């Protein structure tokens, strides 16, 4: 019976990822992996852009130094889609394996995972997978169990790859550990988040965001229900293009409300099993996640968010508010499973009830299976990309790379014309400047990198790009957008192929604009690494090992003395 839960979790992961397990890359929206990602200033939060993907890019640069990037990608996705349901099943306070399986499937086969995976938000999927393990370790810390704190540290570590994941993990860890442990858990949570927190605070351009994104990235309705019912069902992501078609099923709002009702009944049994305080905090945090997710859709909520992101540093993290529904996923999954367990006591055919409850997520969202029924595919980069990388790596000249056409996203025929983030910043061995304006429903949402706006003005005036730290211009072919010939006039063509053309900017190349100060940022990185390393050593080394060795030597010395 011990193997049932791991087996179910493995089946769930393979049902989604089997078509993607061959060699090659899955490139879709924000999910961009490269064969060998270089460690660049942006990966540490030292560039001109805000650290949105810090320390994820730095971690991937180290990982791809050990294994090919496509192998790293498959390991990350498999581990996340396996660990999430496994952790949720283990967290349920019950002796019934069947009820644990219900919770595992509800947690692993959710709209949150599907939509974030299709959006390419793999760090969010990783953070989501960590939450059950964080909750379990936090509850163990609250109970004062041995080695609970290092387990909590290691459970949080993969989640802090991005600011959002780090905050979601840190808050859950603190809530589950309880008030009496705040003196320990809060400093640990802050230290783990230092790799992105310090670059954000010390960023010379500040950390304010455009108010345009408050409404554009708000949770959205997926059927005839409301954004609230979508979020309660763990859906509602702002981008309609990544939503599984089954989320528009007419019965879904009714099923969602009934499921929430069952979950609320089941959550009543958490208090006698976990204790009133942790159970209440756990459920309240889930409710807060729902409230944040739908706040921008309420009357006046969008205006409040727009003011906050443009006046409060760091409030831009509240955009794309549906991501905070991750806090609701565990209460929903555990509560529903416990509700099914409670209902089973009054039914004679308990097996049928549990089977239906377990299969309901798969029945209502079958198009999550098999990589979204072909939505995701494995592709290879054209040879042009490796050729340009080689040219740039062999040149010692100064300067960053400007990628054209000016657009954050690309659509290449070699990737099935899928919308994908420009791979140049992760594929090439130099800092690459790309446009950070995002278009949502045809409306532009301004970016946060002041350097991009400056370079846009330089190109409009046909000024010298080298004076602004640009030493190379990369033109990507076969993707929407155009390049003004005047921008390329006077540049020297270095390499050209069917997909890419690389130009050298002549003359003296000025240094790039300064980012966050290097010393405190690196110190924060080392502090986070030290916390993780300490947690790992603490967990691996036997308790009292050195004290026992010391006592043994003392006894031997005394025996020799006599």
Tell me what each language-model feature is.
Residues 187-190, 337-367, 525-532, 561-562:
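Signature aromatic-anchored transmembrane alpha helix within multi-pass, membrane-resident enzymes
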Residues 42-43, 191-270, 321, 457-460, ...:
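Periplasmic/ER-lumenal interhelical loops and adjacent helix-loop junctions
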Residues 9, 82-91, 98-178, 182-200, ...:
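Membrane-embedded helix bundles of polyisoprenyl
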Residues 9-48, 185-232, 402-422:
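Aromatic-rich transmembrane-lumenal/periplasmic boundary elements in polytopic membrane proteins
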Residues 236-239, 250-291, 532-545:
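Hydrophobic, aromatic-rich transmembrane alpha-helices
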Residues 113-125, 245, 283, 287-338, ...:
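Membrane-helix boundary/interfacial segments in multi-pass membrane proteins
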Residues 6-10, 210-212, 361-562:
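Extracytoplasmic
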Residues 10-85, 105, 110-128:
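Membrane-interface coil-to-helix junctions
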């Amino acid at each position: 019976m011990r193997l049932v839960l791991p087996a179910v979790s493995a089946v769930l992961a393979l049902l989604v990822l089997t078509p993607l397990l061959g060699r090659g890359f899955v490139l879709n929206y924000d999910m961009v992996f490269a064969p060998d990602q270089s460690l660049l200033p942006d990966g540490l939060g030292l560039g001109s852009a805000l650290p949105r993907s810090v320390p994820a890019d730095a971690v991937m640069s180290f990982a791809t130094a050990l294994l090919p990037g496509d192998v790293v990608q498959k390991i990350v996705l498999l581990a996340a889609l396996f660990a999430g349901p496994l952790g949720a099943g283990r967290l349920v306070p019950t002796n019934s394996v069947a009820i644990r399986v219900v919770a595992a499937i509800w947690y692993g086969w959710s709209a949150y995972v599907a939509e974030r995976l299709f959006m390419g938000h793999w760090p969010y999927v990783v953070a989501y997978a960590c939450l059950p393990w964080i909750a379990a370790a936090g509850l163990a810390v609250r109970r004062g169990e041995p080695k609970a704190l290092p387990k909590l540290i290691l459970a949080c570590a993969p989640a802090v790859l991005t600011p959002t994941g780090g905050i979601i993990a840190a808050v859950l860890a603190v809530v589950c550990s309880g008030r009496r442990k705040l003196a320990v858990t809060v400093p640990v949570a802050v230290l783990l988040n230092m790799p992105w927190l310090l670059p954000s605070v010390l960023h010379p351009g500040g950390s304010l965001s455009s108010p345009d994104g408050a409404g554009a990235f708000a949770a959205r309705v997926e059927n005839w229900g409301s954004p609230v019912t979508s979020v309660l069902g763990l859906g509602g992501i702002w981008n309609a293009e990544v939503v599984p078609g089954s989320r528009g099923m007419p019965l879904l709002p009714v099923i969602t409300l009934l499921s929430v009702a069952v979950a609320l009944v089941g959550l009543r049994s958490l208090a006698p099993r976990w204790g009133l305080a942790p159970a209440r905090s756990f459920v309240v945090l889930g409710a807060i996640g729902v409230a944040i997710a739908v706040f921008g859709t309420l009357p006046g909520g969008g205006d409040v968010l727009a003011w906050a992101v443009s006046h409060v540093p760091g409030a831009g993290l509240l955009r794309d508010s549906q991501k905070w529904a991750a806090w609701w996923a565990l209460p929903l999954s555990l509560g529903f499973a416990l509700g099914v367990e409670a209902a089973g006591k009054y039914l004679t055919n308990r097996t049928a009830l549990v089977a239906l409850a377990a299969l309901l997520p798969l029945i209502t969202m079958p198009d999550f299976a098999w990589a979204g029924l072909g939505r995701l595919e494995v592709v290879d980069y054209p040879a042009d990309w490796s050729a340009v990388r080689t040219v740039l790596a062999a040149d010692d000249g100064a300067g960053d790379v400007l990628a054209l056409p000016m657009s954050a996203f690309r659509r290449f025929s070699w990737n099935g014309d899928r919308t994908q983030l420009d791979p140049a910043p992760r594929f090439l061995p130099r800092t690459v400047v790309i446009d950070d304006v995002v278009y949502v429903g045809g409306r532009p949402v301004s970016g946060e990198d002041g350097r991009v706006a400056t370079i846009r003005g330089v190109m409009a005036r046909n000024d010298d790009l080298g004076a602004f730290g640009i030493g190379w211009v990369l033109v990507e072919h076969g993707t929407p957008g155009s390049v003004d010939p005047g921008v390329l006039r006077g540049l020297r063509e270095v390499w050209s192929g069917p997909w890419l053309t690389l130009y050298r900017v002549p003359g003296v190349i000025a240094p790039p604009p300064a980012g966050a100060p290097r010393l405190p940022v690196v110190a924060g990185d080392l502090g986070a690494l030290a916390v993780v390393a300490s947690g790992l050593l603490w967990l691996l080394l036997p308790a009292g090992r050195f004290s026992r060795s010391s006592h043994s030597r003392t006894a031997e010395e005394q025996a020799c003395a006599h």
